Amino acid sequence: MLRIYAPASSANISVGFDTLGAAISPIDGSLLGDVVQIESISTGFELESAGYFVRKLPKEPQKNIVYQAYVLFSEQLKLRGANVKPLRLTLEKNMPIGSGLGSSACSIVAALVALNQFHNEPFSKMELLEMMGELEGRISGSIHYDNVAPCYLGGVQFMVQSLGNICQKLPFFDNWYWVLAYPGIEVSTAEARAILPKSYTRQNVIAHGRHLGGFVHACHTHQENLAAIMMKDVIAEPYRESLLPNFAEVKQATRDLGALATGISGSGPTIFSIAPDLQTAIKLSSYLESHYLQNNEGFVHVCKVDNEGTREIK
């Protein structure tokens, strides 16, 4: 038996729409992500689901993304002249769906890594990553790697999709705390993408290029203040903030409390606030619990970047 944990991820990081993503884990050691367990059975294939958010999964097994991961993996394995072993997959769904924390990516990545390890790793990391992107595209409507790449590989990943590389790891600030607040409501990735305009003004394109270039430069030259200032979103946030509760007011309040930057995690409704120290992170956590959560499903976690990514757990 094998148990694989895939951590939550925060895509875009405000400044890098569809090009940046960070793997995130709570500092208290709790698992904010999905677990897939794989074990041998005598014949065939079985899929089971468990976990707090299991009730949010599709009722038909064929619509479960873990089932689709199994089908894609077996198809690719057949192209190599091999067949999948008889096995049972159990998805522990710990991540809320439509949260902006890479929920589907967690399930996809954990499932494919488990299947690959179970079959003695027939596929390379890049080959697995391509499969992950394809499955993610089936859910959101377009292939993108800004959740699956950091979830799988850890750290902050920059999508280059050139010279045989899908992504490259970006140096980052290990002293920063990420305060993640999920309000308990759902925003579908497809809906959040549909709300975006078909074209942008030249002014916005130039601003986006300046901010992203400045942010990447600041990460490589260890300039925290510049990196934080560059974390501006002219591509998605102005259009998506209407999907989030009191976003403008909450964003300003977090800045007043000392946040270096606040933005939408992925397509929302989770938001992130970057804190320079633990004391500020605790203040932000307390404020967001009181002012951003909408129901008992919501939560706030003080996190750091997870540099390990997807891994085997006991």
UniProtKB/Swiss-Prot annotation:
InterPro entries xrefs: GHMP_kinase_C_dom, GHMP_kinase_C_sf, GHMP_kinase_N_dom, GHMP_knse_ATP-bd_CS, Homoserine_kinase, Ribosomal_Su5_D2-typ_SF, Ribsml_uS5_D2-typ_fold_subgr
Any single GO BP term: threonine biosynthetic process
Record pathway: Amino-acid biosynthesis; L-threonine biosynthesis; L-threonine from L-aspartate: step 4/5
Subcellular location: Cytoplasm
Pfam families xrefs: GHMP_kinases_C, GHMP_kinases_N
SUPFAM superfamilies: GHMP Kinase, C-terminal domain, Ribosomal protein S5 domain 2-like
Annotated EC: 2.7.1.39
Top-level taxon: Bacteria
Keywords: Amino-acid biosynthesis, ATP-binding, Cytoplasm, Kinase, Nucleotide-binding, Threonine biosynthesis, Transferase
Coiled coil: none
Catalytic activity: L-homoserine + ATP = O-phospho-L-homoserine + ADP + H(+)
Keyword Transport assigned: no
Positions contributing to ATP binding: P96, I97, G98, S99, G100, L101, G102, S103, S104, A105, C106
Function text: Catalyzes the ATP-dependent phosphorylation of L-homoserine to L-homoserine phosphate.
Protein name: Homoserine kinase
